[in-house]
């Protein structure tokens, strides 16, 4: 019987505080396999990059790839943070210096309809004893955000039959590297028993000892580098898979060295320093945010309206995590204030639907004020206050006014907000009744920075 080890990481999201221990663990396992003349594979399942971290922001993810090169992964795929959190040009060059293969079967250039040059749909690795392991990868499809970024993202169910059929006959063990989420993984397992192993990610689910669906082994290792997946495949002399032993190893149990903390802090310091070199504007007054102080929010609402070329904007105060003080403004200050990978959306609604949307917002206002938001691009703590520019709501008469005038139910109105408002479940009118246009490639912090630059030039 041959033993093949497969180690997998996923959804690190630039949580580099766990990286020294993860690297040490992976290196140790690879050394052990080499000494025992065993085959070992290492893969990453995407969302290794997340621009909340200043070093990731400052290098457009290139620093993350440098870290991945320390491992020498056999294969990686991308998550939505690489795919949508990068401009098309940034993603096209993210892996220029990578020493590993990027696998991805459902992303194509929107203009040429060809696969990106930095990716391939699959890879076959032959073990020391001749077992052929086929790896292929799929990432979560978000057409609303991939398309305006220049990509044609396709749904896995449309591609899986051909991908599975083309690979199954060539390999002994078939492995799907999935950045699709637990629900999709289970559906795929139920439909494609030809797949032997699905390595899961995206929804941050954790299988300490795996899960079996329709004879397909599922594995998943949580989020933020809190676990590393460790799988041992047992194959017979005919290279048939007989058993898969799955476990998730807690990073907290891994060896920690005294110098680890200095390395972790070094990543932050390097990121801050690089961002501080990039000056944006020279502002004459503080842009604060807090109780009764809305100057930073007002400046951002103005910037949003300028970028979208509209007269009305809506945003929430929980986005603003730090003030921007008077004097020279750099990209580090913008990033600390607005670390979220959020884009703007331009929304058009009939007047009747706009009134309903504002009523939804007012109904949820007190609930959302201190409501903790997790995910969907949000990197803060609570949602906060809903802030309008150009809209007014009369709480006594429940009337909504647009630029001081009553709203006409049959007329069309266009405003700008952040895409987060569309993704969270509190304002369904935006998605159900609205015509939404995503404004790429800038994040909200870049929109604010561009506005400050235009209004407050550096002498």
What are these regions (language model features)?
Residues 1-250, 292-298, 303:
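Acidic, metal/ion-coordinating pockets
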Residues 237-329, 452-459:
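A short C-terminal boundary segment appended to hydrolase-like catalytic domains
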Residues 137-140, 222-224, 237, 318, ...:
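A broadly conserved detector of short glycine/acidic/proline-rich loop/turn motifs that flank catalytic sites
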Residues 103, 219, 315, 392, ...:
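Residues in well-ordered beta-strands of folded domains
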Residues 191-194, 198-205, 309, 314-353:
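C-terminal extensions
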Residues 8-10, 202, 316-318, 348, ...:
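Active-site proximal loops enriched in glycine and acidic residues that flank catalytic Cys/His/Asp
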Residues 26-33, 99, 164, 168-171, ...:
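Structural signal for hydrophobic packing residues in well-ordered secondary-structure cores
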Residues 325-459:
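Feature captures C-terminal
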């Amino acid at each position: 019987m041959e033993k093949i080890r497969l180690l997998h990481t996923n959804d690190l999201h630039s949580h580099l505080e766990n990286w020294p221990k993860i690297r040490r663990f992976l290196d140790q396992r690879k050394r052990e396999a080499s000494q025992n003349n065993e085959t070992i594979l290492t893969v990453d399942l995407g969302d290794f990059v997340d621009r909340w971290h200043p070093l990731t922001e400052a290098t457009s993810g290139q620093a993350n790839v440098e870290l991945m090169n320390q491992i020498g992964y056999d294969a990686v795929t991308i998550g939505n943070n690489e795919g949508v959190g990068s401009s098309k040009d940034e993603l096209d060059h993210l892996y220029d210096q990578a020493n590993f293969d990027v696998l991805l079967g459902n992303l194509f250039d929107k203009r040429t309809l060809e696969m990106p040059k930095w990716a391939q749909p699959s890879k076959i690795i032959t073990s020391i004893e001749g077992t052929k392991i086929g790896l292929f990868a799929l990432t979560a499809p978000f057409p609303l955000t991939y398309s305006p970024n220049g990509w044609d993202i396709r749904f896995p169910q449309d591609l899986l039959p051909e991908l599975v059929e083309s690979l199954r006959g060539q390999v002994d063990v078939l492995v799907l590297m999935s950045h699709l989420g637990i629900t999709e993984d289970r559906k795929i397992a139920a439909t494609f028993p030809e797949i032997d192993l699905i390595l899961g990610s995206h929804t941050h689910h954790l299988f300490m000892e795996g899960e079996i669906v329709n004879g397909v082994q599922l594995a998943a290792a949580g989020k933020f580098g809190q676990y590393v997946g460790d799988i041992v495949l047992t194959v017979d002399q005919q290279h048939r898979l007989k058993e898969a032993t799955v476990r998730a190893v807690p990073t907290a149990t891994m060896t920690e060295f005294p110098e680890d903390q200095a390395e972790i802090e070094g990543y932050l310091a390097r990121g801050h320093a690089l961002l501080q070199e990039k000056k944006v504007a020279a502002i004459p007054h503080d842009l604060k945010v807090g109780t009764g102080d809305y100057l930073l929010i007002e400046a951002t609402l103005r910037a949003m309206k300028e970028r979208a070329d509209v007269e009305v904007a809506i945003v929430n105060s929980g986005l603003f995590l730090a003030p921007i003080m008077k004097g020279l403004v750099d990209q580090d200050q913008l990033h600390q204030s607005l670390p979220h990978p959020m884009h703007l959306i331009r929304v058009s609604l009939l007047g009747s639907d706009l009134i309903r949307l504002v009523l939804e917002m007012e109904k949820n206002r007190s609930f959302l004020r201190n409501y903790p938001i997790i995910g969907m691009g949000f990197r803060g703590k609570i949602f906060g206050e809903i802030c309008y520019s150009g809209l007014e709501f009369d709480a006594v008469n429940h009337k909504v006014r647009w630029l001081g005038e009553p709203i006409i139910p049959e007329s069309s109105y266009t405003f700008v907000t952040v895409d987060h408002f569309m993704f969270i479940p509190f304002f369904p009118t935006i998605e159900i009744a609205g015509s939404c246009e995503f404004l790429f490639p800038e994040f909200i912090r870049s929109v604010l920075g561009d506005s400050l630059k235009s209004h407050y030039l550096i002498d």
